Amino acid sequence: MSNILIIKHGSLGDLIQANGAIQDIKNSFKNSKVLLLTSRAYLEFMSECPYLDGVILDKRLPRWNIFYLNDLKKLLEKYNFSHVFDLQNSNRTKFYRKFLLKKPVWSSSETSLEIGEKLSDFNEESVLDRIEKQLKKSNIIIKNTKNINLNWSIKDISRNLKQYTNGEYILIFPFCSKKHKQKKWPYFPELIVKIKEFYRNKYPVLIAPGPDEIIEAKKM
């Protein structure tokens, strides 16, 4: 039985967007173990994904931290991966290909280019179009890449809703990734006040923070 590695860091939205591709990869390697290399924030969430046989933590420490990179290399080498599917396609994962994972067959944006095609042109396409082309180039049968099914991630929160709402509510996601704080809209507190005024508190306003956003969420 061979081992297959998928690399996906990014944000939660990026991982959700890649979920269909992960399913297609698993379906194409049914007799192999498929593992995901990802960030700490998504270990618990992706550990429940039925298309994965395991999740490996990448602390994503600076590349000058040779002790960490050496430990990560030793860990990855233990799995003896036959294929790597780089769905992140970042400078970091290019570095991993060059120095940490030289032996496996590698699938990335760069390996998916047609003769004469420039990477800059390839990157102008939508994320899912790029992933689909990448997987097709690696002979993956495409069925779910653009038909993402997240039923496995649904949780029963009826008890929470009964505690904080009367059945109807307004849910707000006011946060963004730490790397791109410039994308965060600064007027959510004012918006919440306006919503309460407009609906005269008819609908409770709920916020869905991440683990590091709870204190800030309470201030809203």
Region spans (language model):
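Catalytic machinery of carbohydrate-active enzymes
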Residues: 1-220
